[in-house]
Amino acid sequence: PLLAARRLLGAELIGRGVTAAIVEVEAYGGPADGPWPDAASHSFRGAGGRNLVMFGPPGHLYTYRSHGIHVCANVVCGFDGVAGAVLLRAAVVRTGADVAGRRRGPAILPAALARGPGNLCSALGITMEDNGIDLFDADSPVRLTLGEPVPSVDGPRVGVSKAADRRWRLWLADSSEVSAYRRSPRAPAPGASD
């Protein structure tokens, strides 16, 4: 997952009239018995229900609702049958800022159009109905185009209570679109075992 996360930084996400370059991601592994055990992952307890897409082929979109409200998008990155995904946390809108602005609201500054996972999905028109689509299929409503690898900074993931110190959040250091870091109040103290 971490290799895939690095590869997704700088990639272009194209969806419903908006093109955005990905500037922040978080990697998530899979079940306890898999190659990348990750207690913070939706797939940690195994395949079932909403997380089945995470066990499917790589390059597909896994969507879920955060706190029952915000749609969040992940790129599946494990090989078929092995869970892994990369959460798309933030992007800079390159084209279609007017469309993204209508979706997000008139008071939103350009740098904030796709800052944060829920805002990114809102700006690009990604919904729960997009769960499972192939991001590399030219006919998909949301597509991904990889670019050249870019230098990144890493740090702990945002808002997770398990595996909170894992440095699987990556971002472009010079981007004003990167979201703020917030540690989960339920996470153990930094450096403590979880």
Curated annotation (Swiss-Prot):
One of its GO terms (molecular function) is alkylbase DNA N-glycosylase activity. It holds the Pfam family Pur_DNA_glyco. GO terms for biological process: base-excision repair. The keyword Phosphoprotein does not apply. Keywords: DNA damage, DNA repair, Hydrolase. InterPro entries: Formyl_transferase-like_C_sf, MPG, MPG_sf. This is Putative 3-methyladenine DNA glycosylase. The keyword Hydrolase applies. Transmembrane segments: none annotated. Belongs to the DNA glycosylase MPG family. It comes from Mycolicibacterium fortuitum. The lineage of its organism: Bacteria, Bacillati, Actinomycetota, Actinomycetes, Mycobacteriales. Its EC number is 3.2.2.-.
